[in-house]
């Protein structure tokens, strides 16, 4: 059995939109993403994916679930296999449950600690955003950079006040363990002080929009120019990209994603209408970054300064990308004039010229690959040709995209003038092919059902699944006899309330997996055919939910009264039952 807190953390680090979009091309449709359902044949898209609730639902066949459920159904995997698949993607290790991992108290404590860390970074982000309003120098700096209030708010920019311990204004006691564990406060041999001081603050968010770390930029020319959060339980700089959450819609619209070097580049580009930029977090572009980028778009562009540092960073990105390359993905590299970075270039020339340079002057990976490797090599000599074969061989061996690998080797053959067959012998054994076990996937025999009218309690169950925080409005007394759908509603509410933080829909669905109520939930989703029914989260909807709970409670009490009356006539009541009946009748009269 895999611990529930691990499942929660896995779902928190997994974006269901990315998972499904790799298999089923999604298109933005209002707040959600839509596609033709992969689980039955249809011409009009009725398959909806919610990025906020992290679950999918088909309004025709009723298919629904979390990212785990989608992987299970679409790839034919078991629950443990699907969990392992998703864990591998985000760099998590599936725990072996034994010893203390079986202890619910240990799991609850670990989950509580995680929640405390998340609350700490969120509170710090709010504090920095508020401080920006009161610091003239910080506001003047952003005004000088031409950033609008809308862009500042979109990226949540803030200001870390000068001084050793400004976070004492919002955190008491100071320091505390969470401040140190999130990297907000430095512990220097017992002396504690804020990591970020007198800097413009850039909150770093995970795919769910939660603040997991920060980048801070100086307002002048002092060093270091950028200061980043260290790796923490929330934040791994090698597996996150700045601006990815904020730019997701722009990436979808443009069909491409752009990697730049600095946070300010990302924000400045967005100010000029290029909102699909992201930046690595104080490190070179890693293999994990490349995997993330390829999940976002088919076309990935890298934009670097034209100086030696920029070119070195570009080559490092290319090297880390080689094992991740796919034949249906393309990488491009743009080098700006040495006097410019993306921020200054787009300010000088505007969006149109910047995007023209990006699309028409950038070099595809295949061109940049040979240009870099042959730089300084005299290909008009035999020695130069031999050197190119030697330096390119280990790099070519890393490429598992079959068509691209073949074409690059063919180009090497042309550059050095060696027959492809002879060149293959020189290169040695070809890079091993990745043998992935393929499963013959067939559309499951799900028939599209006609709408079925749901009862009030079933509608309440659906509303609770969509809005888990509404569990606060459910209070069913212990003396009420609950079975069927009523028991399902009560169990759902109890499962939600038992967690320190309100879970999302995807997590609630996983709580119910394998429970006696899983079939009830499936039946309710199969009977939901209108998108409005899955987006009922307004204040009016919440009021209707509370009214519905009052009706259900009265219905249950009436049923309990009738049951007790019948028993009284047939076999009599014991003392506790008599008191309960009297209490219910009195309450009914009042």
Swiss-Prot record:
GO cellular component, one term: DNA-directed RNA polymerase complex
Alphabetized SMART domains for the sequence: DnaG_DnaB_bind (SM00766), TOPRIM (SM00493), ZnF_CHCC (SM00400)
Domain Toprim: 255-337
Catalysis: reaction(s): ssDNA + n NTP = ssDNA/pppN(pN)n-1 hybrid + (n-1) diphosphate
EC number: 2.7.7.101
Co-factor requirement: Zn(2+); Mg(2+)
Binding annotation for Mg(2+) 1: 261, 305
Family designation: Belongs to the DnaG primase family.
Subunit structure as annotated in this protein's UniProt entry: Monomer. Interacts with DnaB.
UniProt-recorded name of the protein: DNA primase
Biological source species: Neisseria meningitidis serogroup B (strain ATCC BAA-335 / MC58)
